[in-house]
Amino acid sequence: MNRLFTAPLLFAALLPGLTAEPSGIDHSNLLVYRDPSGDEHPVKTHADWAKRRGQIVEGMQQAMGPLPSRTALPPLDMRVREQADGDGFTRLSIDFVTEKNDRLPALLYRPKAKRLVKRAAILALHPTSPLGKHRVTKKGGVPNRAYAYELAKRGYVVIAPDYPPFGDYKYDFEADDYVSGTMKGIFNHMRCVDLLQSLPEVDPGRIGAIGHSLGGHNAIFAGVFDTRIRVIVSSCGWTPFHDYYGGNIRGWTSDRYMPLLKTRYGLDPDRVPFDFYEVVAALAPRVFFSSSPLQDSNFDVRGVKKAIPKAREVYRLLGQADALQLRTPDCAHDFPVEVRDEAYRFIDQALGQAEN
């Protein structure tokens, strides 16, 4: 991670497309947008919301750094390292090119079929674990985390990448040019969608994302920046910054997250140029299913319950109020089977997939 990017003036100069960070903005007030003079206007139409959404994405990039250009991307050059038969699928251990000098390790589940059938596909993002992608397999070692395996059994093509620096992904944040590990993750996950769309058995218009904890918010972030993702499931993945450990956002500031939240915004939630009210709303009108347990000590459900009604106003404006779903299981930081099963049914419905 290029530490020069933590200097605010240089950072702003390197982001000519991003305006100065907003001040005094209520990030929960979703149905207003600001014109170039800073004056507020009500969001009444789809076109108005497009302006507000653009400002949300801009605010995210002020904290995360800019999304790198996706023009002239290198070939994916997928390499198969290992192959194993599973329950109706073949599981491949692969790596592929995300950008120059970087190959991303991943697991790829490909359903067995006697003839080519176009299928829906899933980006399955793992929680924090030294196992990385293997945490979401049948033998991941923790109950209620095998969603990559379970979705493959349902007939989906599934890709489960490592997030830097977990699993087999020996990534050096100090050596890259990203402002944040979060943005590197977003770029990688968009490349995973590229790979899924390159497969002959994948219907490119039927792709979803799912994750727990680290994977939960990474699924959301990927969904904001990549509208090819049609349904997003997040377990224990988010709460507004003021509700994250009572507003202590230090946990968001490591290299693999967003260092600018500390170095530029002084660990002050009021200064961070985006919040999860906006991030969730930016997924609209696509299906978003949030599992937010009552006893999750990381991501306080009280904040989630404040944010969902605000985001639903946007979903309602876009004619998809029921596409936003919240479940609050009575458990701690977990993804219980009954909620997973319900989430899978929402994925099936959103992507038109019949369970095998």
Model-found features: residue ranges?
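Cap/lid segment of the alpha/beta-hydrolase catalytic domain
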Residues: 115-201, 245-250
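Primarily recognizes the serine-hydrolase "nucleophile elbow" in alpha/beta-hydrolase
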Residues: 191-263
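N-terminal cap/lid segment of alpha/beta-hydrolase-fold proteins
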Residues: 54, 67-117
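Mobile cap/lid helix-loop segments that gate and shape the active-site cleft of serine hydrolases
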Residues: 234-279, 298-308, 316-320
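C-terminal catalytic histidine-bearing segment of alpha/beta-hydrolase fold enzymes
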Residues: 309-356
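Conserved strand-to-loop "acid loop" that flanks and positions the catalytic carboxylate
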Residues: 284-301, 330
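Bacterial N-terminal signal peptides
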Residues: 6-16
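N-terminal pre-domain segments of enzymes
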Residues: 18-69, 356
